[in-house]
């Protein structure tokens, strides 16, 4: 008989109509006060052949009635034993509770399944929870009636503040409103911080509802300056998040959309906000838009953001070129230079000059050089004019890293000097040429060519130095005699005098 009962309980999904109450009782498929009980699928049962219940709901009801036989049956039908505890709590069936309680390691796992506030509270009592834990969980699981029931115990402003913030974080709006309207709070403004952090529009509206209902004692809504300051702060935070609809809601109550507010939209590339307030609402003057453009440059704004701001200025930036160059030099982002160059506004030379003035290593400007395909001769000449010998050396070390390349570098420098007019710049490069000459080996002809080069550019010190190395070379004096004519024609008296001195020696 036991095996027949077991088979029927587990596998009989359709009860024959001929089964009367007695047979059902024998098979264990009869529920007192309810009628026949049969399993119709894995998660549902049929009661009295016409009522469909989920297995867990039936389990809860059976447990609340203390019907252990039906409870066992439903558990064998894959019912969740959590509902045994819930139902037993509802019906005060403590024998069942003690029997199944040991299977629950953490009572929190059943709280989300409890719908009844009294049962919710009984569960906390069963597990010896504190009142503080009860009210915290009441917020988490949206049991407002529990907070209302224990209203007289919620007197500490600090604790209430924590509960209020928890309700905001959990997005339990009814509880937020009740706490805000009913309990004393330390800092109710936190609702705005949470609303903006979570981008919760409902919470923002609720915050303004509490604010203008005078439920925030720390804020005097009748003090226009304080109120404007608060609302403008909200606008700034909303702009940071890119929440245009938050800003529109805030503006219904006041606040100012100013440079500080829109600079946040610039910093985080929220172009919809910029377009709405600059183009559609016309909130800013041209001067203010120029300030925003400089902020965008300093913050490394995206191409789209920079283009948007430039479009408001019709790409007319002649009156602020100096400021643009300064911003790029100080902050190192040259996206704006790329954009303006495409619009036929070329600031490459100005920025390169600024980089050379402000930085002392080649690596700072290497990316810039590659981006704009700047010719090596141009960089070297500009660095020489500014006496930035270290940058010139770093540049050549990057392009020509091997010692065997020094001869090539020497020839490049000579060619640059030949096309250069800046006197001090030429002297810097000639000094570098002579240092390279001291390191490498030159053939006689190459040395004579270098002598002529020094004479052509009136490099008297280097000329005297190389003459000491060439003095005993064959053909040097006849060569020097030829060079004398060059020095005379060029009117280089110091060179002429030193050549004559060299020619006097036998």
Curated annotation (Swiss-Prot):
Q: Outline what the protein does.
A: Plays a role in virus cell tropism, and may be required for efficient virus replication in macrophages.
Q: Note the InterPro entries from the entry.
A: Ankyrin_rpt-contain_sf (IPR036770), MGF_505 (IPR004858)
Task: State the similarity comment.
Answer: Belongs to the asfivirus MGF 505 family.
Instruction: Kindly provide the name given to this protein in its UniProt entry.
Output: Protein MGF 505-4R
Any Pfam family the entry gives? DUF249
Q: What is the scientific name of the source organism?
A: African swine fever virus (isolate Pig/Kenya/KEN-50/1950) (ASFV)
Q: Which domain of life is it from?
A: Viruses
């Amino acid at each position: 008989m036991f095996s027949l009962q077991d088979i029927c309980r587990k596998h009989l999904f359709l009860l024959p109509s001929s089964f009367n109450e007695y047979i059902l009782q024998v098979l264990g498929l009869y529920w007192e006060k309810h009628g026949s009980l049969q399993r119709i699928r894995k998660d549902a049962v049929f009661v009295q052949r016409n009522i469909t219940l989920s297995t867990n709901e039936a389990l809860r009801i059976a447990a609340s009635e203390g019907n252990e036989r039906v409870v066992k049956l439903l558990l064998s039908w894959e019912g969740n034993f959590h509902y045994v505890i819930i139902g037993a709590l509802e019906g005060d069936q403590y024998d069942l509770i003690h029997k199944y309680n040991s299977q629950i390691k953490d009572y929190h796992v059943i709280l989300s399944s409890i719908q009844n506030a009294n049962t919710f509270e009984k569960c906390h009592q069963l597990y010896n929870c504190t009142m503080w834990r009860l009210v915290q969980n009441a917020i988490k699981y949206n049991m407002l009636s529990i907070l209302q029931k224990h209203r007289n115990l919620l007197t500490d402003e600090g604790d209430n503040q924590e509960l209020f913030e928890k309700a905001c974080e959990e997005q339990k709006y009814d509880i937020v409103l009740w706490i805000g309207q009913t309990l004393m709070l330390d800092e109710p403004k936190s609702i705005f911080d949470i609303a903006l952090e979570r981008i919760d529009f409902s919470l923002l509206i609720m915050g303004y509802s509490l604010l203008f209902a005078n439920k925030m004692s720390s804020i005097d809504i009748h003090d226009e300056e304080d109120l404007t300051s608060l609302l403008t702060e909200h606008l700034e935070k909303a702009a940071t998040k890119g929440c245009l609809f938050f800003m529109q809601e805030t503006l219904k109550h006041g606040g100012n959309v100013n440079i500080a507010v829109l600079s946040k939209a610039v910093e985080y590339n929220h172009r919809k906000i910029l377009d709405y307030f600059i183009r559609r609402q016309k909130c800013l003057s041209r001067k203010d838009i120029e300030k925003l453009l400089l902020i965008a440059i300093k913050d490394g704004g995206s191409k789209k953001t920079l283009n948007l701001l430039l479009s408001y200025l019709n790409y007319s930036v002649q009156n602020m070129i100096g400021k643009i160059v300064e911003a790029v030099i100080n902050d190192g982002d040259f996206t704006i230079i790329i954009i303006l160059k495409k619009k036929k506004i070329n600031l490459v030379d100005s920025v390169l000059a600024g980089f050379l003035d402000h930085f002392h290593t080649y690596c700072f400007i290497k990316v810039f050089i590659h981006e704009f395909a700047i010719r090596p001769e141009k960089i070297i000449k500009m660095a020489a004019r500014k006496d930035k010998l270290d940058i010139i050396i770093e540049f050549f070390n990057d392009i020509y890293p091997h010692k065997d390349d020094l001869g090539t570098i020497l020839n490049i420098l000579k060619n640059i000097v030949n096309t250069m007019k800046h006197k001090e710049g030429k002297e810097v490069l000639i000094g570098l040429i002579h240092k390279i000459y001291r390191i490498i080996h030159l053939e006689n002809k190459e040395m004579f060519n270098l002598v002529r080069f020094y004479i052509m550019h009136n490099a008297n010190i280097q000329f005297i130095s190389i003459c000491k190395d060439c003095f005993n070379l064959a053909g040097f004096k006849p060569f020097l005699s030829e060079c004398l004519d060059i020095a005379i024609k060029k009117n280089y008296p110091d060179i002429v005098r030193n050549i004559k001195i060299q020619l006097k020696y036998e």
